[in-house]
Amino acid sequence: MYCTPNLLEKWAKYTVDINKNYIRKNSYDFHLITKPFDASVTHAWQKIPAMLMLFQENKYEYVMYIDTDAIFYDQTIKIEDIINKYQGDIIVCSDEANSAGKYKVNGGALIVKNTPAAIELLIRWWELRNEYKEFAFEQWALSDIVENKIDGIDGSIISVAPETEFNSVYNEVQTYANDTSKPPPNRFVHHFMAMDDKTREHVFSKLYDELVPENDRQYLISAGK
């Protein structure tokens, strides 16, 4: 995860803890990055060098990135379950339902395999940061890569999964945000994109109470806050 420090004082403390609890239960490694690699571009781009940094250690076969405003909800599902369904070195979810077809993919969560082709694509994607300075930033660039609109970048190594595989359809998360008395759909990941801080604080504190048992909270960052 990449998160700016100011958000950790707000709703992000809940999402970090929810996700860290999922990671701990499944014996994965969890990395929280809070310092930008290039402060001249928006935070949305920082996920790319964060993943490249982890691959430099040559410790991981796969790295999964998830946005700060997204959480692992159905915690019985394993990341390997997704990996085994798709052939691409990079797996990402569609954003067509959320953007009326404008963007092919959503950059809020992606799974990357440690292969030369995937690492080269991440490097080339990062190099586009000064060319895609308007919304949707890195997501727009990745959508163009998927559609093979950028010379010299092979988008064929990317598998595009449905929105609800490990991301969200906006209408679903918006419905839950409007009425948290009813549970959200039982999805692997819920991504509460394009919502204000007050809404996210309410939603994530509610989901934190649901997903993180009290006896597990001693392991998490909010225990010290």
Predicted feature descriptions by range:
Residues 70-107:
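Conserved donor-nucleotide/metal-binding helix-loop-beta segment in metal-dependent transferases, i.e.
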Residues 50, 90, 109-111, 189:
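Conserved hydrophobic/aromatic beta-strand scaffold that supports enzyme active sites
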Residues 1-61, 116, 216-218:
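N-terminal anchoring/stem segment of glycosyltransferases
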Residues 42-49, 117-225:
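Catalytic core and acceptor-binding pocket of nucleotide-sugar-dependent glycosyltransferases
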Residues 106-121:
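Conserved nucleotide-sugar donor-binding
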Residues 33-35, 93, 161-163:
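Conserved beta-strand termini and adjacent loop/short-helix elements that scaffold enzyme active sites
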Residues 60, 86-89, 185-187:
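Short, high-confidence coil segments that cap the C-terminus of an alpha-helix
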